[in-house]
Amino acid sequence: MLIKLLTKVFGSRNDRTLRRMRKVVDVINRMEPEFEKLSDDELKGKTAEFRARLEKGESLENLLPEAFATVREASKRVFAMRHFDVQLLGGMVLNERCIAEMRTGEGKTLTATLPAYLNALTGRGVHVVTVNDYLAQRDAENNRPLFEFLGLSVGINLPGMPAPVKRQAYAADITYGTNNEYGFDYLRDNMAFSPEERVQRKLHYALVDEVDSILIDEARTPLIISGPAEDSSELYIKVNKLIPKLIRQEKEDSETFQGEGHFSVDEKSRQVNLTERGLVLIEQLLSEASLMEEGESLYSPTNIMLMHHVTAALRAHALFTRDVDYIVKDGEVIIVDEHTGRTMQGRRWSDGLHQAVEAKEGVEIQNENQTLASITFQNYFRLYEKLAGMTGTADTEAFEFSSIYKLDTIVVPTNRPMIRNDLPDLVYMTEAEKIEAIIEDIRERTGKGQPVLVGTISIEKSELVSRELTNAGIEHNVLNAKFHAMEADIIAQAGQASAVTIATNMAGRGTDIVLGGSWQAEIAKLTEPTEAQIEEIKAAWQERHDRVLAAGGLHIIGTERHESRRIDNQLRGRSGRQGDAGSSRFYLSMEDSLMRIFASDRVTSMMRKLGMKPGEAIEHPWVTKAIANAQRKVESRNFDIRKQLLEYDDVANDQRRAIYAQRNDLLDVSDVSETIGSIREDVFKATIDAYIPPQSLEEMWDVEGLQQRLVTDFDLELPIKEWLDKEPELHEETLRERILEQAVEVYKRKEEIVGIEMMRNFEKGIMLQTLDMLWKEHLAAMDYLRQGIHLRGYAQKDPKQEYKRESFAMFASMLESLKYEVISTLSKVQVRLPEEVEALEQQRRAEAERLAKQQQLSHEVEKGALMSTTEAQIASGARKVGRNDPCPCGSGKKYKHCHGRLQ
């Protein structure tokens, strides 16, 4: 009550921010007549003037009014488009490290030109981030004439571009690209073997379009570059054949419930659980299929891999549905993005799930992958010095933007008042009744010339509505992942009178639906249109536009509520752009997944008690409240998951930053001999201390063991026993120094043979190679630790603290191994002629280039990860030989010192 009163008196924080910014808008408006008088050359000269003032120490904030006035005037001359006052407000919000919520149709793309220009003046680069390649290319090409008029360069960063082209794109003042591509380039740069292979500059300012989609919907989606593991496709096929024999039961067994089935599904957490009966049956089936010894338990350590396959196959059959979660096209399983309804070509689920779905669908099974490098979007975008974003719907997620990214959300007012009529939800008992009511509404709306957009949450639902409309004789277009290529054309005509368009979720996001259709699309179809033709098309469009407005504008129909209110608001936001008329209504049924999983049973029983007749809908505050509560519950749960993921990933992130900083330092220096000398001392001291403990009696020394170790690990044959026999006064300190001197001397002789420059290059190459190999192994170990750490909770320990403690110990151990492996490899290397060394180096580079070309990018969704497949490293499966295990060849040596050693 008190907060409401204070807000009434002083205004909300949003109001106060906008009030402050409006004063700056007034300043910019007062400058307009002055800037209109400037010639084109004088206007272009402003960029050089601003840069000179920045160099003298003036701040961007001081330059902002003039810079914005410059962009506005340039836009009027280049595009014949003038930035509205609200777009200037949006530009200021974006410059202040905030999220700007701007409604659909308010011109976010044009708004972005303001802060992009201002921040590009620093010469440190601006990254404009979009959700797909089409939008990146479209926005870059659309805005290029404006930026180039003002003397700024524009780059486009797209998948598959060669490194020199990417480097050029990143060197531009303003670079357009997708979130995935920026992230993958960052990871690839940190796997480079020379400074020339890197493409990115230091991350300065990121301007994220559709920021909610990237920083929230995809926050649980790590970007991963991975290499193939061993082939286990045969096992997936065998396990897949057994799953249909298992019967699903309604819920999990408990003290009060004992089912007759073999597994239960928890739809909330998207997990599958075997029952006791199910475990007995699957063990029996696995034994019969000769996949497991009779009498063995599926949960025994030797069957961990088998358990993994059974779980993946069960999830594939019980949780993942064709045409909802994925489609099968050209013998390939392609994931469908649950947030946009778009297909995600090349992306793959991890943890063997994708292979299990491929086995289920009977298509070719591709190899599993092992992580070589990974980062989440949360941590990638927090690397930028300055981050801002814009979207049509951010206010519902303002708390998350603030708590995770430290970004405030400012709601920018619309240029014209919003007059869309959002009608109350209608709730039906069954889905069939709901579909019937939707068709009736469509028939009524199109009868009076109103265009209709029907939003569905999956391809399956969009095809169901499409079939029913076809049966009812209503013409319509379907926009879903299967017809992705036609997206722009369908969206362009979705505003025509009586047009009916069915779209999955937010397909076509980023493209406005213009009432009366798109006149630009009509002109684009003509080759070299004349002025007269253009005027004729515009006049015909204006007539259609007015007719559609008179009919009520675009009507939105939601076929069910999404888990997030934000996605519902995005669907509604397609209508009522720029003050146009429009309306929206959601049709729900008690069979909808949100209602079934999250809304209470009380609502269903209440509706039954009301004695609803078939086809009758209910509009009741209780039902609306129950739906809102269900959505809030899901949003809160999803936020907790993202927050927890971030807390765990922050541990890995600190280590990642340390390793990548070390790696970049290595790349940038030409001489690492000092570092090698320093770690050689550490390694030899630790090795000698293990056999000759400091300040110990000679009787405690294991001289033979030390001699053997020096030969095995450092290829260093020293007569230590003879030295001690001949020189009784030789104590441990002088012995330690002599061993180190001998090691350095042997190394120097090798250096003389191959030459100093060649040796420096070789040292650097070995350090990078060893670092990459150990980091890859460390990532796999961290992954295993993360998967089982929650079990520590049963021992009354905090899993997060345990994870931090153990991962730090693992990291420290990895750094020690790095020192040891580098010195061991350099000591054991066989000296060859300089020409041979050069040939080997060229061979290694050629191999690295070949592997880089083979990279394909993919993306894990929900639980998994975004993977980029490369054959860079061969990863092992369940029974991998550990580096400290005995070598399988039977030599008796450790694997790392025998067939597993670095060549």
Swiss-Prot record:
Record-linked Gene3D superfamilies: Helical scaffold and wing domains of SecA (1.10.3060.10), P-loop containing nucleotide triphosphate hydrolases (3.40.50.300), SecA, preprotein cross-linking domain (3.90.1440.10)
InterPro entries listed in its UniProt record: Helicase_ATP-bd, Helicase_C-like, P-loop_NTPase, SEC_C_motif, SecA, SecA_CS, SecA_DEAD, SecA_motor_DEAD
CDD domains: DEXDc_SecA, SF2_C_secA
Origin: domain of life: Bacteria
GO CC, alphabetical: cell envelope Sec protein transport complex; cytosol; plasma membrane
Induction per the UniProt record: Repressed under conditions of excess protein secretion capacity and derepressed when protein secretion becomes limiting. This is regulated by SecM.
A single GO molecular function term of this UniProt record: metal ion binding
Protein name stated in the entry: Protein translocase subunit SecA
Source taxonomy: Bacteria, Pseudomonadati, Pseudomonadota, Gammaproteobacteria, Enterobacterales
